[in-house]
Every structure is written in structure tokens, then in C-alpha cells.
């Protein structure tokens, strides 16, 4: 229990929505605990430090999944044995130093790979606990911060990845990845489908088109899925693509087995009410699906964290990788046409899922902050070369 005024500084990043969602889940949980003596502040470090350059990098990152896959692959897998080598290791250093001087946090929580934090822990000799919430299922070296107090990871296999590169096992906790509590709340699946004019006795295939960043080929996929899966109905989430929603709505408006939606705040209900989902393997999306025990098909995952997540889920029996739309259609047909494999996948997910990750992490954070010392004067520990950057 926090009995003295304490402050948690959360460093996150807006490269994709997942890191921000994790941050929000943790903030919401801490707020729900009504801790009068605790304040929580969030900062998108790279965006605040270098807004123009970071905006350019974000656009490249998003487009890399479509146009620059080999380039991103080279970036992601470069020098995996050199844990301290990262070309943007000092990116955001000035901003981070100023944040620590201004805010004087009692604990720093990273929900985004932040290599610059290792500069502080290795060279500044700060005495502030640093914790990290890893939002993927396989380790990448940029998640490692030397002398961290805690790492919160998704699975025991992820913990082994950390141990294998020399991280103290006692600092790594297998908690699962934090998501919104609503994904662990019971849903009346039958009523939800009825309310949306769908048949609760049919197998519902959920497709998240917005996840792929493309707007072509989905009409053929839907048509072929329905042709090869006799007892199926399809829910297509088009995201923010109004053009895709218009074209698909026009094509399937008279088909009672197809529901076309735009952006929705009800992914929780749709995941809970579907038997299979076609999506990209972003860490948070698949964790939400994992919580709802919905087997997933990963269509042409991009090299990097997406592919690593997909390979892990396939290895564990939670999902399958399809390199092409045609392969995805075949997998759907195989799983929905009286095959026990789908039931077995759901059962495996039920057995292996970790519940209430957000609550577990927040309780441990409070324990860490309860044992932390008063924040020291950061400036006194800053090396001479870095003091020129401090405002």
C-alpha cells in the first residue's frame, strides 16, 4: 500500500496503437485502485523529443509492413548478439534527462522499447527503479535495460529468452501482457449475435481488414470463405477505410451471412462471439484474442515482431500462419468443416492463458514503489558531456 506521495513516470511510444493501449490499461487500473498518494504521468518520449523526425519515422514504420519489408527485416534482426548496439541509443536523451529532473519519479515504467534508458542506468548511476512491460511474445534486444528492477513478460518462454541473454531470473515476472479488463468479462455471445442480425448457430469468422492497411481482395476472400465453409458467417471490420466499407457493403448488402462494419469500439464483443479470426499478429490484438480464446489466422505476417508473434502462436497451437489469401481460405475451411482441430485449439488456449495481467502488474509496481528510496538529485549524476543538453 502506498502511504507516502509517490510518482510513476510511464515512458511509451505511439508506433502503432499497442503500446499506448497497454499504457492506458495500466493507468486505468491504477486509477481504479483509488490511491490518494500516487500520481501517474505518461510521456511519448520520442514524439516529444523530436516530433518532426519521429513523425517521419512513424510513417516509414507503418509503410514498412507493406513496401519496405526487407529493410525492416534487416533493422529488426541486425546484430542480435550485440545487446548494447542500437543506432538510436541516444535518441531522446535530452528530453529524458529533463523529464527526470522535472518530475523526480519514484519509479520509471517502460511500455515501449527505449534503448536510451540504458544510457541512464549504465552511465548516470541513478537509483530509481526501472520496470518494463514487454508487449510482444519474443525478446528483442531493444527491450533490455541494464540494471532494471523488473521485466513483465508474456510467457515462460519469453522469460527463458531473457535468462538466455544473461538477465537475472529474479527480475523477470511472467504476468501476461496487460489489456483492458473488459476482455476478461463474460459476454452473452448468443444475444450479441442476435442483436446484430446474425445466426448464433453458425460459425462466425471475424476479419479485421483495418489491421492489414490494404483495401483490395477482401471481397474475394469473403465470397470464397462462404463457398467453402457451409455453416459460416463473416463479420468484416473495415477500420477507418470508408472506401472499403462502402464497396463491401454494396457487394454484400443482400447477403445475410455477411456483416460489414467500419471502425468499432466493440472488438471485445466480436472476439468473444466469434470462432475464428483473421488478423495481423500485433502483440496487443493477439493478446486480446488469446484472452477470448479465439484461434487466429495470421495473413502474411511482416518480418520482425509480427512474424515472431505469429510463429510463437502457431508453435503453441493458438493460431496458424497463411502466406496468401488462398491459403487462409483453405485453413478456414479445414477448421470450420467438422474438424476437431478448432475445438482443440480453443481448449489449448483456455489452459494456457494468463488472466488478469494488468492487475498483477499494478500490484507488483506498488510493491516496488513502496520499497523505493526517495528520488535522488538526478543532475548530480549526469556526466559532464550530457549536462550541456539539460535545459
Curated annotation (Swiss-Prot):
Q: From what superkingdom does this record's organism come? A: Bacteria
Pfam families referenced in this protein's UniProt entry, alphabetically = Glyco_tran_28_C (PF04101), MGDG_synth (PF06925)
Q: What class of enzyme is it?
A: transferase
Q: What is its EC number?
A: 2.4.1.315
Output the CDD domains linked to this UniProt entry: GT28_Beta-DGS-like (cd17507)
Q: In which pathway does it act?
A: Glycolipid metabolism; diglucosyl-diacylglycerol biosynthesis
Q: Which reaction does it catalyse?
A: a 1,2-diacyl-3-O-(beta-D-glucopyranosyl)-sn-glycerol + UDP-alpha-D-glucose = a 1,2-diacyl-3-O-(beta-D-Glc-(1->6)-beta-D-Glc)-sn-glycerol + UDP + H(+); a 1,2-diacyl-sn-glycerol + UDP-alpha-D-glucose = a 1,2-diacyl-3-O-(beta-D-glucopyranosyl)-sn-glycerol + UDP + H(+)
Q: Which HAMAP family match?
A: Diacylglyc_glucosyltr
- Name the InterPro entries for this protein: Diacylglyc_glucosyltr_N, Glyco_trans_28_C, Glycosyltransf_28_UgtP, Pro_diacylglycrl_glcsylTrfase
Which function does this protein serve?
Processive glucosyltransferase involved in the biosynthesis of both the bilayer- and non-bilayer-forming membrane glucolipids. Is able to successively transfer two glucosyl residues to diacylglycerol (DAG), thereby catalyzing the formation of beta-monoglucosyl-DAG (3-O-(beta-D-glucopyranosyl)-1,2-diacyl-sn-glycerol) and beta-diglucosyl-DAG (3-O-(beta-D-glucopyranosyl-beta-(1->6)-D-glucopyranosyl)-1,2-diacyl-sn-glycerol). Beta-diglucosyl-DAG is the predominant glycolipid found in Bacillales and is also used as a membrane anchor for lipoteichoic acid (LTA).
Entry keywords, A to Z: Carbohydrate metabolism, Cell membrane, Glycosyltransferase, Lipid biosynthesis, Lipid metabolism, Membrane, Transferase
- State the gene name recorded for this protein: ugtP
Subcellular localization, as worded in the UniProt entry: Cell membrane
Query: Cell membrane: present as a keyword of the record?
Result: yes
An example GO BP is:
glycolipid biosynthetic process
Any GO molecular function: 1,2-diacylglycerol 3-glucosyltransferase activity
Which Gene Ontology cellular component terms are annotated? plasma membrane
**The family this protein is said to belong to:** Belongs to the glycosyltransferase 28 family. UgtP subfamily.
The yes or no answer to whether the keyword Magnesium is present is no
The name under which this protein is listed is Processive diacylglycerol beta-glucosyltransferase
